Swiss-Prot record:
<dbReference type="Pfam" id="PF01774">
    <property type="entry name" value="UreD"/>
</dbReference>
<dbReference type="GO" id="GO:0016151">
    <property type="term" value="F:nickel cation binding"/>
</dbReference>
<protein>
    <recommendedName>
        <fullName>Urease accessory protein UreD</fullName>
    </recommendedName>
</protein>
<dbReference type="InterPro" id="IPR002669">
    <property type="entry name" value="UreD"/>
</dbReference>
<keyword id="KW-0996">Nickel insertion</keyword>
<comment type="similarity">
    <text>Belongs to the UreD family.</text>
</comment>
<comment type="subunit">
    <text>UreD, UreF and UreG form a complex that acts as a GTP-hydrolysis-dependent molecular chaperone, activating the urease apoprotein by helping to assemble the nickel containing metallocenter of UreC. The UreE protein probably delivers the nickel.</text>
</comment>
<keyword id="KW-0963">Cytoplasm</keyword>
<keyword id="KW-0143">Chaperone</keyword>
<dbReference type="GO" id="GO:0005737">
    <property type="term" value="C:cytoplasm"/>
</dbReference>
<comment type="function">
    <text>Required for maturation of urease via the functional incorporation of the urease nickel metallocenter.</text>
</comment>
Length: 278
């Protein structure tokens, strides 16, 4: 039985709205197609693009008005064997101030044998006073390949607005076959950014399968940044973390890393999404 406090929080959560987007990618005649999709609420997807032939480029659209108290968004992505999807967003995910209930975004990615996912979203912006829960889970079957980044922006640095109160619970889980993978949780509350060294921006870039040679390729780029950054290998999973005070600088850093990692991991030249040029 739920406690009184839990019942009150549940009632508050019910005051928000729900959205669910489910996408399934399949390979047909050597080309990846959006085989099926379902949506409920304002989570949408634009028509696929094919700027490089076989891989399918898709833009995921979050609610234009942002994510507010009690909202619950779920994104489910499934890649069938041999498929290759590149997903990005035309804009940031904005979590606004909440006086009570938590806004929740849950993202699940399942990658079948031999499939390839590039998950390259814009940043998630948490306004001062936001109460947010963000969970991203990736499951890779044998032979699957992954390039994925996630950017957390606490406050609005460009407007000199600090994340001086509020709470964030962020989970990043990557499951690899026969390996430990990654299970990382970050909790921030009350505007205390000591875990980030006072930096309002944190980016995590994950790539698999990687090896020592790939690690050595990215380290010189990180050394040039002039701000805290590091890279490590967890089995065949490369994990890169970067702290910053400037969102545009951080986005450029992630794109530079992607230009290096895409040929190294996927054996393909970089083909940036058109939205990056706007």
């Amino acid at each position: 039985m739920m406690s009184l406090a839990e019942q009150i929080e549940q009632q508050q959560d019910d005051a928000g709205w729900s959205a669910h987007l489910q996408l399934r990618f399949v390979q047909r005649d050597g080309v990846t197609r959006l085989g099926a999709w379902k949506h409920f609420g304002p989570l949408l997807v634009q028509r696929p693009f094919y700027p490089e032939g076989a891989p399918c480029h898709v833009y995921v659209l979050h609610p234009p008005g942002g994510i507010v108290a009690g909202d619950r968004l779920e994104l489910d992505i499934h890649l069938e064997p041999g498929s290759h999807a590149l997903l990005t967003m035309p804009g940031a995910s904005k979590f606004y101030r909440s006086i009570g209930p938590t806004a929740r975004l849950t993202q699940r990615f399942h990658m079948a044998t031999g499939s390839t996912l590039e998950w390259l979203p814009q940043d998630s912006i948490f306004f001062s006073g936001a109460r947010a829960s963000l969970a991203s889970r990736f499951t890779l079957e044998p032979g699957a390949r992954l390039l994925a980044w996630e950017t957390l922006c606490l406050g609005r640095p460009v407007m000199h607005e600090r994340f001086d109160h509020g709470a964030l619970d962020s989970l990043l889980h990557i499951e690899l076959p026969d390996e430990v993978g990654l299970h990382e949780r970050l909790r921030l509350a009350g505007g205390h950014l000591g875990k980030l060294g006072g930096h309002p921006l944190l980016a995590t870039f994950c790539a698999a399968p990687a090896d020592q040679a790939v690690l050595e390729q990215v380290r010189p780029l990180l050394d040039e940044l002039g701000n805290p950054a590091g890279a490590t290998l967890l089995g065949s999973l490369l994990v890169i973390r970067v702290l910053d005070h400037d969102n545009q600088h951080l986005q450029r850093t992630l794109q530079r890393l992607w230009h290096v990692l895409r040929p190294a991991i996927l054996g393909l030249p970089a083909c940036p999404p058109r939205i990056w040029a706007t």
